[in-house]
Curated annotation (Swiss-Prot):
Organism: Shewanella oneidensis (strain ATCC 700550 / JCM 31522 / CIP 106686 / LMG 19005 / NCIMB 14063 / MR-1)
Transmembrane segments: none
Homology family: Belongs to the TRAFAC class translation factor GTPase superfamily. Classic translation factor GTPase family. EF-Tu/EF-1A subfamily.
Compartment(s) of residence: Cytoplasm
Name listed for the protein in its UniProt record: Elongation factor Tu 1
Length: 394
């Protein structure tokens, strides 16, 4: 079959499988790939290709992940699957694979297990917006009441973590039987694909979000004023737009009087572009690296937040020893390090390299942040952890 060319015209959605070890996440990933390729065209990936996940390094952390792509008539999906539990934890915290929605795989022979709960909690902490449930191995359960019981249990567990447990789609199927080509189970995979299409809304593109550019450098150009440079993270800035300088100091307002890229003057700077922004009436000393330029009112500076953190293992170049409460590392946000103190959850005395942990952080100066912002934890310029802002306090 001819390889379909990448369709730019279709909306692109990022999804992934989550759930307990051996509940069939990778088998389901292979089944989706096969059934959709068979039904709508495209390339099918085998279980072994997906299971043999290549190693990637994201911010110095080694993660094994498999990326596959598939299509429904209305959308193009990029799907990520991880072989090991630790890979999921790292993947979700570093945001190596941002998900617009997740497929929670639960074996109906087991029901929810410890990692099922942990993955749901992580999804909540890192801001995965939508979850669809695939109850797997239903061919091995003869008792309809038992299936109903497992479904209820999963729905309750999701509600416990503030997902709409009563309303989200639950599909009962068998990934293995679908992969073996049994029509009644293949139909369940198509039902899952239809649920992805209808339940996960089309993600807002970066360019449609409010303007934000982390400031990397500040220059003074005689006769013209102050230029800040950086890569536009989201949105568009146009000449004449009012912008705010947020973080580290008191927020100030100014106007963008010029945008340049590769020494050419432009009318606007867009998400993904590296540009220089000329600011009206701003002195060289009024701005510094680590602040952000943003659409007024779209982002605020904060100092205290709850985060979910993965602490690098010794093998990953992290610490060799645990840390305790009162630990004061640097927190690296976007372009700069800020010192902060940590508070560990009640009953937790120390954190070992390789652990993931929820912690409350208080920074010594405010940083422009939203929930979902990723950061690194560093000691003397060396990364020892990765985290995500889960909840802002102040």
């Amino acid at each position: 079959m001819a390889k379909a060319k990448f369709e730019r015209s279709k909306p692109h959605v990022n999804v992934g499988t989550i759930g307990h070890v051996d509940h069939g996440k990778t088998t389901l990933t292979a089944a989706i790939s096969h059934v959709l390729a068979k039904t709508y065209g495209g390339e099918a990936k085998d279980f072994s290709q997906i299971d043999n996940a290549p190693e990637e390094r994201e911010r110095g952390i080694t993660i094994n992940t498999s990326h596959i792509e598939y299509d429904t008539p209305s959308r193009h999906y990029a799907h990520v699957d991880c072989p090991g539990h630790a890979d999921y934890v790292k993947n979700m915290i570093t945001g190596a694979a941002q998900m617009d929605g997740a497929i929670l795989v639960v074996a109906s022979t087991d029901g929810p297990m410890p990692q099922t709960r942990e993955h749901i909690l992580l999804s909540r902490q890192v801001g995965v917006p939508f979850i669809i449930v695939f109850m797997n191995k239903c061919d091995m359960v003869d008792d309809a009441e038992l299936l109903e019981l497992v479904e209820m249990e999963v729905r309750e567990l999701l509600s416990e973590y503030d997902f709409p447990g009563d309303d989200l789609p639950v599909i009962q199927g068998s990934a293995l039987k679908a992969l073996e080509g049994e029509p009644e189970w293949e139909a369940k995979i198509l039902e899952l694909a239809a649920a992805l299409d209808s339940y996960i809304p089309e993600p807002e593109r970066d360019i449609d979000k409010p303007f934000l550019m982390p400031i990397e450098d500040v220059f003074s150009i005689s006769g013209r004023g102050t230029v800040v440079t950086g890569r536009v993270e989201r949105g568009i800035v146009r000449v004449g737009d009012e912008v705010e300088i947020v973080g580290i100091r008191t927020t100030t307002k100014t106007t963008c009087t010029g945008v340049e890229m590769f020494r050419k003057l432009l009318d606007e700077g867009r998400a993904g572009e590296n540009c220089g922004i000329l600011l009206r009436g701003t002195k060289r000393d009024d701005v510094e690296r680590g602040q952000v330029l943003s659409k007024p009112g779209s982002i605020n500076p904060h100092t205290t937040f709850e985060s979910e953190v993965y602490v690098l293992s010794k093998e990953e170049g992290g610490r060799h020893t645990p840390f305790f409460k009162g630990y004061r590392p640097q927190f690296y946000f976007r372009t700069t390090d800020v010192t902060g103190t940590i508070e560990l959850p009640e009953g937790v005395e120390m954190v070992m390299p390789g652990d993931n942990i929820k912690m409350k952080v208080t920074l010594i100066c405010p940083i422009a942040m939203d929930e979902g912002l990723r950061f690194a934890i560093r000691e003397g310029g060396r990364t020892v952890g990765a985290g995500v802002v889960a909840k802002i306090f102040a």
